[in-house]
Amino acid sequence: MADQRKAALDVAIRKIEKNFGKGSIMRMGDATDMKVASVSSGSLAIDKALGIGGYPRGRIVEIYGPESSGKTTVALHAVAEVQRQGGTAAYIDAENALDPQYAEALGVNIDDLLLSQPDSGEEGLEIADALISSGAVDLVIVDSVAALVPRAEIDGDMGDTHVGLQARLMSQALRKLSGEINKTKTIAIFINQIREKVGVMFGNPETTTGGRALKFYSTIRMEIRRAEQIKNGTDVIGNKAKVKIVKNKVAPPFKRCEVDIMYGEGISKTGELLDMAVENDLVDKSGAWYSYGSERIGQGRENAKKWLKEHPDSMNELMDKVRVANGMEPLNEKSTKETADDKASGKTGENKQETIEEASKE
């Protein structure tokens, strides 16, 4: 009986492959690489919270939160990281609010960035579809879902009601896009705004725009909220942002982290690197002094951050050590790798340079 079932299954598989092509169905054990490839978010803390070292390729990501919480900043850091690895990024600016100077300050090469400012939601999603289907774009960002206004609403009069029009538009678009996104291994990031549901007495009244479709199709949903101000004396120089991974299909969800978003600079990479290096015993903190290896790098957190910024080679080396210590692939072509013996013997600060393989990019 078991042999008959197996023979029937083999016949069915051959028939499917004949009708739809080789690889249309397979046993998961036959897959050459089942590991989900990822691209760094540009933030060590967020990469760790995501669980796989960055945003997964071929998947949909939703970033949402209140106004001025840092959603666009986080998305632009992803653009800079994709470009740093030699990839191509596209930005669909439905809000018409992208600041090129700020993007450049975050490390984005604006000369190579593909930018579209569509006149309607249909146009923006058609442009996204064309870019994704080309297979030549690594990252597409839609900023934002709330600004993808259906053409019927634009052509209508003020005050006209268009119930569920945007939700139907998003549902149709995502049905079409999800397959192409997976096939071309493109990362699609949708930035979204929050609204409040009327008449909710119990529970959270907040919801995101564009209906439920994006919630279902997203592999990762990331909530960003402003926590507190960062001050230098009396001057406000940035904000602390709390990031929560609300949904994650490729790693355990509900991880949280905090990032410093500095005005005109974006996410403070030196700050989060220093904090995580201390957590992993790669940087020694004794009182107010920070030491890396045999060298004292600064008294107080701000001075230690300044030292890292002034020594990019040491910063890149330390960043790769932190990534490896947290189970992530190193980013830089050359890095110091700490072996288990080194860690056990406390030699975490020695400068042993060794070449590592560049993170694979599918």
UniProtKB/Swiss-Prot annotation:
Gene3D superfamilies: P-loop containing nucleotide triphosphate hydrolases
GO annotation, cellular component aspect: cytosol
UniProtKB keywords: ATP-binding, Cytoplasm, DNA damage, DNA recombination, DNA repair, DNA-binding, Nucleotide-binding, SOS response
InterPro entries (alphabetical): AAA+_ATPase, DNA_recomb/repair_RecA, DNA_recomb/repair_RecA_CS, P-loop_NTPase, RecA-like_C, RecA-like_N, RecA_ATP-bd, RecA_C_sf
A Gene Ontology biological process term: SOS response
Sequence intervals crossing the membrane: none
A molecular function (GO) term: damaged DNA binding
Domain of life: Bacteria
Composition bias, Basic and acidic residues: 331-362
Compartments, record wording: Cytoplasm
Similarity remark: Belongs to the RecA family.
Role this protein plays: Can catalyze the hydrolysis of ATP in the presence of single-stranded DNA, the ATP-dependent uptake of single-stranded DNA by duplex DNA, and the ATP-dependent hybridization of homologous single-stranded DNAs. It interacts with LexA causing its activation and leading to its autocatalytic cleavage.
NCBIfam families: tigrfam_recA
Protein name according to UniProt: Protein RecA
